[in-house]
Amino acid sequence: MKISNASLLALLLPAASARFVEQAEQNRVMLFPDGIPEEPKSTTKYHIELSPGDTRWVTEDEKWELRRNGQRFFDITDHAELGTFNKRPYKKSVFPKKPTQKKDLEPLLKNLSKTEMEDHLTTFTSFHTRYYKSESGRQSSEWLLKQVRDTIKAAGADDTVTARHFEHAWGQNSIIATIPGKTNATVVIGAHQDSINLWLPSVLAAPGADDDGSGTVTILEAFRVLLQSEDIIKGNHENTIEFHWYSAEEGGLLGSQAIFTTYEKARRDVKAMLQQDMTGFVSRTLQAGEVESVGVIVDYVDPNLTDFIKKIIVEYCDIPYVETKCGYACSDHASASKAGYPSAFVIESAFEYSDNHIHTTDDLIKYLSFDHMLQHARMTLAFAYELAFADFAKLEKGHGDL
């Protein structure tokens, strides 16, 4: 069956544009007179894991078809060994019984800025796509690294705090910013920087405002304000804090798998990992008559870390949380979990009310709430600061209420 350009666009573009496409169909307007741009074809096979032990080999087109149907997965083609290097006996994760740093955090929380997040997100979404194999995806990563380094320099922290690319073969690199503490015990805050249009990833625009531009700028803002603490930039805190911006999450958690494979091989002591993926969309929650809240993922996460994050939300956020589920391999925290590290994930809402514009040309800033993103930034900043000063050695020995 031959399909016209206009008919194909009706499938590719947001529903809001469908009326224009229908009119073009009636008038036989050729929107692509030279033909629909073709996605580069590849016969390469990729090994994916859809659930524990459920693997198959697929083409790249089949990967995107699975994603369009809502199926998430690890692409384990190059990372089949993730989770096999850490042979230490299982040790139950332990976290503080309650938040203890509110006095020091209160002045910092007041410095979080919606304007900073909006300015960064406006530029970040101006790249045609942040698809991890694209040139604009590479450029967006370079731009983001510069913002992170500029943030460090503006804080006067460039003698101690570092930011670097974690390089990948596909061109768009992940980014790791490190705030050294007194010990090598590490707390990780993550988001993914790439975007995708699941119809023609190499061709169509993917502004990715919510997925995951919102998470990217949310943790960048938490990072900026965290560096306003003299104790933090002087390294007076116990634990090393890392902020990660992962490449190629949309391709099957590729960037985070590469990083956590390296960490697992090196026996890095990661105490906690929190992922922020989609932090700005609340419309469907409110339309359903539900209370604005943040969504705490409760499947395929560390329950003790998740309970601690709930306490952080209650203590430091102005809105409540709701428990929700997102399935296997639904974001980069899954890579940390697979490596044996306690991980957690907080999203913008109950999963069923999350943003329905993602992976299209219509994932735009106009649908987002920066007030809601501010709540995620408050949680992220408080999480980082509280665990920066946690004495995990004492906690793991069962001493004290730290």
Curated annotation (Swiss-Prot):
Zn(2+) 2 binds at residues 211, 250, 359. Keywords: Aminopeptidase, Disulfide bond, Glycoprotein, Hydrolase, Metal-binding, Protease, Secreted, Signal, Zinc, Zymogen. It is an enzyme of class 3 (hydrolase). Zn(2+) 1 binds at residues 192, 211, 277. Its main location: secreted. Disulfide bonds join 326-330. Its cofactor is Zn(2+). One of its GO terms (molecular function) is metal ion binding. Residues 1-18 form the signal peptide. One of its GO terms (biological process) is proteolysis. Binds 2 Zn(2+) ions per subunit. Glycans are attached at residues 111, 184, 304. Residues 19-92 form a propeptide. Belongs to the peptidase M28 family. M28E subfamily. Monomer. Extracellular aminopeptidase that allows assimilation of proteinaceous substrates. This is Leucine aminopeptidase 1. The gene is lap1.
